[in-house]
UniProtKB/Swiss-Prot annotation:
Name recorded for this polypeptide: UPF0335 protein Atu3758
Coiled coil: none
InterPro entries linked to this entry: GapR-like, GapR-like_DNA-bd
GO MF term list: DNA binding
Family from the record: Belongs to the UPF0335 family.
Originating species: Agrobacterium fabrum (strain C58 / ATCC 33970) (Agrobacterium tumefaciens (strain C58))
């Protein structure tokens, strides 16, 4: 009985270690990708593009059309309420 518990704990520890190591590898890949994105944005900035606008466009492209329209409508409503239009 004790041997079975020990085996179960060993298997659980090995499985836990695998999960942790997978996440660590993904974090390393994520850092590399973030570095690549930074390089691309630096290149765009060097060519005269506004990186803030590029990031906004990327964020908007991730949303579906209805969500974008709703966000724009709310923004326009708030701007009008503040006399900004």
């Amino acid at each position: 009985m004790m041997d079975e518990t020990s085996t179960t704990e060993t298997v659980a520890a090995a499985e836990l270690r695998q999960f942790i190591e997978r996440v660590e590898r993904l974090e390393e890949e994520k850092a590399a990708i973030q570095g690549d994105i930074k390089d691309v944005m630096g290149e765009a900035k060097g060519r005269g593009y506004d990186t803030k606008a590029i990031r906004t466009i990327i964020r908007l492209r991730k949303k579906d059309a209805n969500e974008r329209i709703e966000e724009e409508t709310i923004l326009q409503t708030y701007m009008a309420a503040l006399g900004m239009e």
